Amino acid sequence: MSRIKLIVGLANPGAEYAATRHNAGAWYADLLAERHNQSLKEESKFFGFTARLNLGGEDVRLLVPTTFMNLSGKAVAAMATFYRIPAEEILVAHDELDLPPGVAKFKQGGGHGGHNGLKDIISRLGNNQNFHRLRIGIGHPGDRQKVVGFVLGKPQAAEQRLIDDAVDEAVRCTEVWMKEDRLKAMNRLHSFKAG
């Protein structure tokens, strides 16, 4: 059984970014904390907001970096080093252009796919790509030139509902993973249809 000791929700800091697509990872982390009656509190030595959860009998740290997205690895590496958590026991939730809104998927390893948050985490973990990811679909603007504006934009209401549904199911599936097993959680999440 693959244990998870650190769950990270990627985001840009500040109210102006809170509702943007690039912050989908933080929406997941916030909901996970809320479901377990915890609130994320700022902890400067970890460059982010943190909480401690009990998931399936495991002591799990939750982290939303307050660095900008392209420096996310600074926060992840600080916490992973302090608690001696190997890459294989880290789950990073992030927005995913290659999946449509309403879809979320677990994945282990692989490259960064152009995602600056993942790029920095891989680099700061010593080029270790073996951490788990939760890819939260936000869709693609269709034109590479429009990607930056798209990820820093806010979803339309219908899109937001689909993303929220997928995030909600991802939280439930994270609990299935921790209480039962990863494969069962993956199968359930990957067959989920929002809407």
From Swiss-Prot:
CDD domains: PTH. One of its GO terms (biological process) is rescue of stalled ribosome. SUPFAM superfamilies: Peptidyl-tRNA hydrolase-like. Keywords: Cytoplasm, Hydrolase, RNA-binding, tRNA-binding. TRNA binds at residues 17, 68, 70, 116. The active site is at residue 22. InterPro entries: Pept_tRNA_hydro (IPR001328), Pept_tRNA_hydro_CS (IPR018171), Pept_tRNA_hydro_sf (IPR036416). The record marks 95 as: Stabilizes the basic form of H active site to accept a proton. Pfam families: Pept_tRNA_hydro. GO terms for cellular component: cytoplasm. One of its GO terms (molecular function) is peptidyl-tRNA hydrolase activity. Monomer. Belongs to the PTH family. PANTHER family: PEPTIDYL-TRNA HYDROLASE. This is Peptidyl-tRNA hydrolase. It comes from Erwinia tasmaniensis (strain DSM 17950 / CFBP 7177 / CIP 109463 / NCPPB 4357 / Et1/99). The gene is pth.
